[in-house]
Amino acid sequence: MKSYLAGLVLLALPCVPPVLAQEKQNFVFNPSTPEGQILQALGQETDDAHRVSLGQDFLAKYPKHEAAGWVAAQLESGLLGQKEYDKVLEVAETAYANGPDMDGAYFALKAAVAKNDVEQTKKWSARTSEAARKITGSAKPPADDEAKHELEYAKEVDEYSEYGLYVVALKAQPKEEVDLVDTLIKQNPKSQYLPEVANSYFAALSKAGEGGKACPAAAKMAVDKNAEAMLYAADCNWRGNKADAVISYAAKAAEAASTRAKREGVSDGDWAAQKAALVGTANFYTGVGYTMQQRFGPANKALKAALPTIKGNQSLYAIALFDLGLANYQLGKPLGDKAQMREGLKYFQESAGMAGPMQDQASRNAKLVLAELGGK
């Protein structure tokens, strides 16, 4: 049985996470010296071209100065403003060799993301996250407002390190997308961006000839609020004829989708529609799971709840109609409840009218139930 989740790729436009001002200057300088004058001017300059000129001048004259890392970051920032992405990466690589700097790594990552460069994005995402986590991983609470600001800044930089992998993955070829998402999973298995890329990632695994890894990956990713991975895991277990797991994953997916916080940049209406689609699909898997167990009462309830939101997915809709036909027939027959049996007939007939794997059997079932009802 194939996966029926292809129609559930819910990808909103990526929303760039905000990042606060750069980290503080961890050095002291004398503004009366030639190098101090450049540093002072660089700290006050807002024009990208002037910042680039000042940064290049300083690094050419004072490459071993204790402020060289900070200056390199200012130079990278100016080059970013000029969209000189290759030069940003060149400066960053040289600066990194002389000592890791969080701002320098962050600006290099922004350049790599702007280029959609897979290898550079992976490299600088890892370096950016490592530098940020040296600050966020401290056991000591912030001593003052400045330390709190630095901590918040580091958290946002670390978040951007995940965002960079995510946004480049969305534009990558299947093998590269798989590589980038695998890197993101390793970097943070609970990343807020994994639900956004989950279905695209599972499809990319198949396109890359690694479809056999999709179900294990979904089970691994089905944590926290990742409703998309939970639904894929439910689908895997449905195809594997494991009803208990189908119902369990579906319930978790419904809970995750219902309680997920709204993303920035998404309208209330769009967010409500996306959540409804996820919950509706979760209801579908709950219903088919109960049908597998021949628990037709709960199946009937879940599948009816699913219908309005899965109508756009013809494959799921036809199966839901078929299982509703079966549930209502089986609920009505032992009681001699012809009204409920006719309800089952109606669902079988609707399913029979839809092209797909259920069509022939739905048509046969409809004829049998109709005959049992006396042809009317």
PLM feature spans:
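Terminal, low-structured helical/coil segments at or just beyond the last alpha-helical repeat
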Residues: 25-30, 277-282, 330, 335-376
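N-terminal leader/linker segments that initiate helical-solenoid repeat arrays
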Residues: 18-74, 83-86, 90, 98, ...
